[in-house]
């Protein structure tokens, strides 16, 4: 996991957590300059999501623990707010439930599509519909790549399947 930092380190901390398969820059590049004027902005790039690290996303709990440990070490265990988009919202919920850090505000964002341009959202929506339809209808993804990834995970973590 990598955390990117913006703004004054002594300012109130806002933690930004991106959505599934989203790069932190694509989710937050437009708001970071605005937030960094008055806040210390931390953007999390999960294991397996960052081009600067050779890592693999394992579990939500493992990643949540890493985020909490970072907040304890770098922020004294206290942040003003955490905003999570999609998958990031799940992390915000887990951190609130676990109570290992103090978070003044937790904001759960919606779908990643709500941050995209109309054209990009339309294209992503159509791609997702085609994948999800075949999964629901046939019980398999139409993409051989996705099927191979799922099969690899089944072998690696049979307790989840």
Go through each PLM region and give its residues.
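Conserved HGGG/HGGXW glycine-rich cap/lid loop of the alpha/beta-hydrolase fold
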Residues: 2-53
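Gly/Ala-rich beta-loop-alpha elbow adjacent to hydrolase catalytic centers
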Residues: 84-92
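Active-site loop/oxyanion-hole signature of alpha/beta-hydrolase fold enzymes
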Residues: 42-81
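Flexible "cap/lid" loop of the alpha/beta hydrolase fold
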Residues: 93-97, 103-135
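Structural signature of beta-strand start/N-cap positions in the alpha/beta core
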Residues: 13, 40, 79-81, 105
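Short beta-strand immediately N-terminal to the catalytic nucleophile in serine-hydrolase-like folds
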Residues: 82-84, 109
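Conserved alpha/beta-hydrolase catalytic His-Asp/Glu region
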Residues: 116-123, 133-161
